[in-house]
């Protein structure tokens, strides 16, 4: 991942003047280059909700550089955000927690799509968290801003501060994990946080003739790209490890979409590096076997 993101005509990471950002975010008088860059997410034409200044895009500020890769708006976050907008039943009136959020695009989208409470988190680094707050302020106003909060969290550590954002005794209905499973050494810590923050499954019983859990079932969305194709198997190891945790988990594929390679000259098959995979996982219900379920999509 040594090369700058590709600039495309569809908003992957456009030149700032394309969006009029020179006027929106005035250049500092200092001769030094600004520590931030900007990217945008174009709202699908069939989705209608209000964005400040009647913009058709969400504007995301990215940290100038960071070892946790928060200085890019990943194609995975774009694809996941579109999925959330096109699958409203999974987000509306829900308590949502995003882990390792980077620029926070999916969380902002959840607020606009009607989630009742959204907590957007990243590693407890003040630069990352301040940048998340900036993106919330730029893209949300009024009552919408009251439904989102920014917090720091180290995977596997105490979740009490995260649960403290909700009414006593409640947990989250939806967890968002966008481009996190590449961090193979942290799978166990990530699963520990997932287990501790997702609410228990609903009372809906398992139907063998329809093995997929309803979209309203408490679940986690795990979207990612195999940025290092030779380690794809290690990315995928997250799912069987999740399935064996706690009382067991089931999972199904919900998205497979070509989004383009983030870094043109990186090693490995370009098609693999440019394809976003989206999975949904839930705790097994009574009588349900853990593990992979039939995909919801036609591959």
From Swiss-Prot:
Similarity remark: Belongs to the class I-like SAM-binding methyltransferase superfamily. EFM7 family.
Binding site for S-adenosyl-L-methionine: 74, 100-102, 122, 155, 178
PANTHER family noted in UniProt: HEPATOCELLULAR CARCINOMA-ASSOCIATED ANTIGEN, PROTEIN N-TERMINAL AND LYSINE N-METHYLTRANSFERASE EFM7
One Pfam family it belongs to: Methyltransf_16
HAMAP family attached to this UniProt entry: Methyltr_EFM7 (MF_03223)
A molecular function (GO) term: protein-lysine N-methyltransferase activity
Recorded GO CC terms: cytoplasm
Role of this protein: S-adenosyl-L-methionine-dependent protein methyltransferase that trimethylates the N-terminal glycine 'Gly-2' of elongation factor 1-alpha, before also catalyzing the mono- and dimethylation of 'Lys-3'.
EC number annotated for this UniProt entry: 2.1.1.-
Keywords for the protein's UniProt record, in alphabetical order: Cytoplasm, Methyltransferase, S-adenosyl-L-methionine, Transferase
Keyword Ribonucleoprotein part of the UniProt annotation: no
GO BP field: methylation
Recorded coiled-coil stretches: none
Protein name: Protein N-terminal and lysine N-methyltransferase EFM7
Subcellular location as annotated: Cytoplasm
């Amino acid at each position: 991942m040594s090369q700058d993101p590709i600039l495309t005509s569809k908003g992957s990471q456009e030149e700032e003047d394309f969006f009029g950002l020179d006027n929106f975010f005035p250049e500092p008088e200092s001769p030094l280059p600004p520590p931030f860059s900007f990217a945008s997410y174009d709202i699908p034409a069939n989705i209608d909700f209000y964005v400040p200044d009647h913009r058709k895009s969400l504007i995301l500020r990215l940290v100038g550089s960071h070892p946790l890769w928060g200085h890019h708006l990943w194609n995975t976050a774009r694809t996941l955000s579109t999925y959330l907008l096109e699958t409203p039943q999974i987000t509306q009136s829900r308590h949502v927690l995003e882990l390792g959020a980077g620029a926070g695009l999916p969380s902002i989208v959840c607020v606009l799509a009607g989630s009742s409470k959204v907590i957007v988190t990243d590693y407890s680094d003040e630069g990352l968290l301040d940048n998340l707050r900036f993106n919330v302020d730029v893209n949300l106003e009024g009552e919408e801003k009251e439904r989102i909060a920014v917090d720091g969290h180290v995977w596997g550590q105490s979740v009490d501060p995260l649960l403290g954002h909700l009414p006593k005794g409640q947990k989250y209905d939806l967890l968002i994990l966008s481009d996190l499973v590449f961090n193979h050494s942290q799978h166990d810590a990530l699963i520990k946080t997932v287990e501790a923050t997702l609410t228990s499954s609903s009372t809906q019983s398992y139907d063998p003739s329809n093995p997929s859990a309803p979209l309203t079932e408490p679940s986690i969305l795990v979207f990612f790209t195999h940025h290092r194709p030779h380690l794809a198997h290690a990315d995928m190891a997250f799912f069987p490890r999740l399935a064996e945790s706690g009382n067991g988990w089931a999972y199904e594929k919900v998205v497979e979409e070509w989004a383009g390679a983030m870094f043109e000259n990186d090693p490995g098959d370009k098609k693999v590096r440019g394809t976003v995979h989206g999975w949904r996982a839930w705790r097994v219900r009574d009588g349900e076997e853990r593990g992979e379920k039939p995909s919801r999509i036609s591959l």
